[in-house]
A protein has these predicted regions:
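Compositionally biased, charged N-terminal/linker segments
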Residues: 1-52, 102, 138-154
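GIY-YIG nuclease signature motif recognition
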Residues: 9, 62, 72-75
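Short, flexible beta-strand-to-coil junctions
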Residues: 11-15, 61-66
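Residues at structural and domain junctions
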Residues: 41, 58, 117-120
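Small-side-chain structural scaffolding
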Residues: 44, 60, 70-72
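Short coil-to-beta transition motif at edge beta-strands of beta-rich domains
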Residues: 48-62
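Aromatic- and Lys/Arg-enriched surface recognition patch
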Residues: 67-140
């Protein structure tokens, strides 16, 4: 996967937005995600500004429901605050909404990016081994989406 990074983007749906609004959107172009009001954690803002690159992978995690509902790619580099959206996701039809989401227990048990110890930031980094594990799990739980997942996950 070259130099691409893998991230988790965490949201709490109780704030009135859920990832299905992205996955079900008819948007043909890139989808603007996140603004200053939405992401307050300094570490998340720094990751987005300095490290998120176009093509990076994002696991979409809903904290209150404790599951990964899908995967998307960044359609832009991360931006600094004050420039509108902090980052754009790929058009929804290029992303994958999992038929069988990965749940916190047991699927994500040993994956640090999802543990409370990793802090409360919206955006967290997923390391190589964790990504390999997540990829295997996704394919195992969603065999009928294997082709789309392989295309997206590489």
């Amino acid at each position: 996967v070259g130099q691409l990074n893998v991230w988790v983007f965490k949201i709490n749906t109780k704030r009135g937005w859920e990832f299905d609004q992205y996955f079900r959107s008819r948007a043909r172009g890139a989808y603007e995600l996140g603004d200053e009001g939405w992401i307050r954690s300094a570490s998340s803002l720094r990751y987005i500004r300095e490290e998120v690159k176009r093509g990076d992978l994002f696991f979409c995690y809903e904290v209150d429901r404790k599951w990964v509902v899908g995967v998307a790619r960044a359609a832009s580099d991360g931006r600094d605050t004050g420039m509108g959206s902090l980052l754009d996701f790929c058009p929804p039809r290029e992303a994958v909404r999992l038929k069988n989401p990965l749940v916190r227990h047991p699927d994500l048990d040993h994956i640090l990016a999802f543990s409370p110890q990793r802090g409360r930031g919206t955006v967290q980094k997923i390391d190589r081994d964790e990504f390999a594990r997540l990829r295997r799990l996704m394919l195992r739980k969603n065999p009928e989406q294997a082709e789309a997942l392989r295309r997206l996950l590489g």
